[in-house]
Every structure is written in C-alpha cells, then in structure tokens.
Regions:
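Membrane-interface "cap" regions at the ends of multi-pass membrane proteins
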Residues: 1-35, 64-69, 79, 83, ...
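Transmembrane helix-boundary motif of multi-pass solute transporters/channels
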Residues: 2, 16-55, 66, 203-209, ...
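Membrane-embedded translocation segments of transport machinery
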Residues: 1-16, 207, 211-375, 379-412, ...
Length: 582
C-alpha cells in the first residue's frame, strides 16, 4: 500500500507569486475586454454606463473574486472538491461551473483559429480583405479602403464591404442556416489543430509549464495594446471616436437592459462563479495575501477594459471619418469588431500589414491564456476528484491529451460551412450570463449563510494577517445574492431568441437545443442537493446538518486553535475539580 501511495505525485504550487498573478490576469483579461466592454459602453450610455458597471464591480465582481480565491487557497482543492470540503450540499455548484467551462473550451478556441487565419493572411503583399478582385468576391463588393472612393448611403446599403465578404465567404464559407452544415473548411481546421497543440503544451506539465508560459502570454498583449493605442490616437478622427465612446447619456440609466449588460460583463470579465479562480488560487501557499491580490487584479481588469475602449474607438472614429458616415454605422461588438470593423479600418492605414499583424497577435494572446487556463481549471478539478488514478507519473499528460481530443471532436461541426450557427448557440445559451448569475446566487448564499461569512472572514484573516473590509460580509450575505437574483429574473423576462446577422431566425429545434445547453448546468445545482438529501442516511434534519458541515480535516485558523485550547483547558480543569471532590 505504501508503495502505491508513493507513486502519487504532489499537487504542487506556483513557482512564485508573479506566476499566480500573471495566470489570473491572463485568464480574466481576455477578448471581452477588447471587443465587448467598449461596445457596451458606447451603446448603453457612454460614460453613464460606468455607473451600473461600478455598482456591479462593488456588489458582485470584487466580493465573488475574493471569495473564490480565498476558497481555493484555503482548501488547496479544485473547483469541485473544494465545495465537497466546505459544504457538500453545494457540490453541484462546482459541477455546474466545470460544465460551463467545458462548453467554453469547446467554442472559445474556434475564435483563436479564425484569428490565426487572419494573422497568416496579414503577411500577404495585399491584405485579402482590402480588395474586390478575389475569387470569393461578388459583384456587390465595394472596397472601402480604395483611394478617391466616393460613397453615398444608397451605395453602402446596396453593396457589401470587402472585409465582410472575406469574413463571410472566405473564412466562414457561410451557409444558409444551421440546417445546411456543408463542407469542412480545411484551412480553419488546420488553424484549430495548431491552437489545440499550443494549448496542450502550455498546460501539459501543470503549473510548472503554465506558470512559465504566462510570463509571455499575459504581458505581451499589453505591449500590442499600447502600440495600437498610440497609433489609434494619432489618426485623424480619433477624438470624434473617443467622444462617441464616452459621451454620457444619463437617461439610459433607467433602461433595465443597461444594468443587465453591466452585470453580465462583470461576471464574464472577472471569471467568477465557474471555479477558475478557485483552481488557480489552490496552487498558492496558505499564507499568500489573496486579499490584496484580488483587489489589485480587479482594478487591473477594469482599467484594461477602459483603455482598450480608447484603442478601439479611436480607430473606429478614423474609419468613420474616412468613409464620411456616422460612427454608429461602423461600431461593432464581438467577432464583428475583431474580424470585420477593425481589419477594415487597418486596411485604410499606411503600412496596413504591420497593424494587422499587431492586432491579431494581440487577439490570439488575449484569448490563448483564457483558453488554456480554463483547460487547466477543468483538468485540475477532475484530477482532484480522482487523485489515486490521475495523479500518477505520465497520466496527467495522457488525460489532458484525451480532454483536448474530446473537445476537438465535439467542436468539429464548428469549422463547417454552417459552423458559425452552432458557435452562436454555444455562445448565447451554454455560456450565457443567466447561467453564471444563477451560480453566483447560490455561491454567495451558501458561503454567506451556511458556511458562514464570519468564518470566511476569520479564514482570510488567518491566511493574510489582515481582516477584509466589512462591506464584503454585507455583499456575501445580502447584496451579491440580491443583485444576482434580480439580474437573473430580469434576464429571463427580457429574453429574446437568438438571431444571426439580424436576419436569420433559427428553427425551433435549435432553440430547444440551446435551452438544453443552458439548463444542463443550471439543474445540476438543485439536482445535486436534492439527490444527496434523498440518498443520505438518518432523518432529514441529520442529513441536512451533515451535508452543511465542512470537512473537519480543513486547516484550523488561529482563532479556532485558541478556542480549542480554551475548551480543552476548561474541560481539564473541570475534570481536575471533579477528581478533587471525589
């Protein structure tokens, strides 16, 4: 038996504090900071959008960020087993979070394959999205980057920009709908394979390899962002774009959709409620100051989003001025910004290949560490569930390889002609804000009331030697669950079915599939709790008490040790007094 146990590998720790900080920064600072936050800010009231954004930062983002990093550092466990040790009744939250991460791993890397294809295309003598002389172009194609081009509104309505045709007809080979899956796009498939190979070798040795890779993947995007920011601010029309980005519209604050979008952006941008932060913090040493780390990482995340907006809208302002049209007509979000609007703007600049290469390197690196850290979170959580089987020499590498192959085969359909429609289903339903909001409600309720916010405060104080601000206790017990519940209900009330390009309506079976993906994670939370209650032994009250009790093997805080000594001393004194009386 001793010989078998001796073969189990140590879980390990980060090589340095910098590795942890860079890994978390690389995970939480991703594509959403560049292509989602700036667009939301302009669309929902400019500078006024920062008010609901900051409200959600204070009530949900930072409190949950601190809570999850503290949970991981205290238990030294992954996203599932940490719940088993803190509150077995809530273990379904861990399973649900890992399922959402699994869905994310399956579709998020497709974006990186598109970006890699654009990066390779950027090395051509003429950018392929900057001309209408290619085999994929139609008679309606118009090259907006052409010099001395005279445009009017009628021309724009009746034509298709070259960048749009490159995206839809060359990269996606877009079919007529999800019913028409069509052929495999072999070039995108090869790019996808390349990205999976890179991600595999980034995490195959665990934190030993991840901790070294993030020194590059988490820092170099900032170099690219700075370069693009300086270039954008020096373009004509940049000021117009920035004013459009931040001009406040206070009236929009009365629109519930503005608050919903702000809440969803915070939850995704901060990567809370899905277990990623718990896993990353679990590789810290017990006495790391996770309280200070969490505050600074949250500040870095939000500041990056704000600065990225200047880089994006300065370029969109330039493009609008060059075309002589309002910025609202060129502003895009998501893939539309990264693969149509920005490449189109780059094509209008001097040295377009240089700026295209810089932009797509930044996009790839921003998404890369988000992808491989999510993979690390899932694999670590599963390995912590089965340490006797998976934590043996050579088995981690095999398990990660099988995980990559499973995700790759599952996403194969996304690189077909109808793949973008499946991609949108995953993005809109499987990983949507409502699922994460649902988890955040129960996470804060369980840790605030069942495990105990006061106990969590003692744990953080014991680990960091500093007691958190009292506002965090108020958030965990009241504000975070209240805000999350209201946002979840509103998101259900305000639900609108998914469409593609504002014209394609999915068939009913596709919507049913989307809801199945969304509910697959949500039902795990109550389903696990009810299953454990029914499967347990004893009375219902005994089962409830057992499932709400933390693992007695968890580390004791200084306060708990002092209380135990006092209890032991009191008991010994009582025994001594009783013995003397006898």
């Amino acid at each position: 038996m001793d010989r078998i146990e001796g073969q189990i590998e140590e879980r390990g720790h980060w090589g340095s504090k910098a590795e942890f900080l860079l890994a978390v920064a690389g995970n939480v600072i991703g594509l959403g900071n560049v292509w989602r936050f700036p667009y939301l800010c302009y669309k929902y009231g400019g500078g006024a959008f920062l008010i609901p954004y900051l409200v959600f930062v204070v009530t949900c983002g930072v409190p949950l960020f601190l809570l999850e990093t503290s949970m991981g550092q205290y238990t030294q466990e992954g996203g599932i087993t940490c719940w088993h040790r803190l509150c077995p009744l809530a273990e379904g939250i861990g399973y649900a979070g890992q399922l959402i991460l699994l869905y994310s791993c399956m579709y998020y890397i497709v974006i990186l394959s598109w970006a890699l294809f654009y990066l390779i295309s950027s090395f051509s003598s003429q950018l392929p999205w900057a001309s209408c002389d290619n085999t994929w172009n139609t008679d309606d194609c118009v090259n907006l980057a052409a010099k001395n081009l005279t445009l009017n509104r009628t021309t724009l309505i009746n034509s298709t920009p070259a960048a749009t045709e490159f995206w839809e007809r060359r990269v996606l080979s877009l079919s007529g709908g999800i019913e028409e899956i069509g052929r495999i796009n072999w070039e995108i498939l090869l790019c996808l394979i390349a990205m999976w190979v890179i991600c595999y070798f980034c995490i195959w040795k665990g934190v030993k390899s991840t901790g070294k890779v993030v020194y590059f993947t988490a820092t170099f995007p900032y170099v690219m962002l700075l370069v693009l920011l300086i270039r954008g601010l020096t373009l004509p029309g940049a000021l117009q774009g920035i004013v459009f980005y931040l001009y406040p519209e206070p009236a929009r604050l009365f629109d519930p959709q503005v608050w919903l979008e702000a809440g969803a952006q915070i939850l995704f941008s901060y990567s809370v409620s899905v277990g990623t932060l718990t896993v990353l913090a679990s590789y810290n040493k017990y006495n790391n100051n996770c309280y200070r780390d969490s505050l600074w990482l949250c500040v870095l995340n939000s500041c990056t989003s704000l600065v990225a907006g200047f880089a994006v809208f300065s370029v969109l302002g330039f493009m609008a001025q060059e075309q002589g049209i309002p910025i609202a007509e060129v502003a895009e979000s998501g893939p539309g910004l990264a693969f149509i609007a920005y490449p189109q703007a780059v094509a209008m600049m001097p040295l377009p290949q240089l700026w295209a290469v810089c932009f797509f390197i930044m996009i790839i690196l921003l998404g890369l560490d988000t992808q491989f850290v999510s993979m690390e979170a899932v694999t670590t959580s599963v390995m912590d569930l089965f340490p006797m089987i998976l934590r043996r020499e050579g088995r981690r590498e095999i398990f990660i390889l099988l995980f990559c192959l499973t995700c790759f085969l599952g996403q194969f359909i996304m690189v077909t002609e109808g793949g973008i429609y499946v991609f949108q289903l995953f993005d809109y339903y499987a990983c949507n804000g409502a699922c994460v909001l649902f988890l955040s409600v129960f996470e804060s309720l369980v840790m605030g009331w069942i495990f105990g916010a006061e106990r969590m405060f003692d744990i953080i104080e014991d680990m960091t030697k500093s007691r958190p601000n009292y506002i965090f206790m108020l958030c965990w017990k009241y504000l975070t669950p209240l805000v999350s519940v209201v946002s979840f209900v509103c998101s259900m009330v305000e639900y609108t079915p998914l469409t593609f390009n504002r014209w394609y309506v999915y068939p009913d079976w596709a919507y049913a599939l989307g809801w199945l993906l969304a509910l697959s994670s949500i039902v795990l939370v109550p389903g696990w709790a009810l299953g454990q209650l029914f499967a347990g032994k004893g009375s219902l009250k005994q089962r409830w008490r057992h499932l709400c009790s933390p693992d007695p093997e968890l580390p004791l805080t200084c306060k708990q040790r002092a209380e135990m000594k006092e209890t032991t001393f009191t008991a010994e004194m009582e025994d001594l007094v009783r013995a003397n009386i006898d």
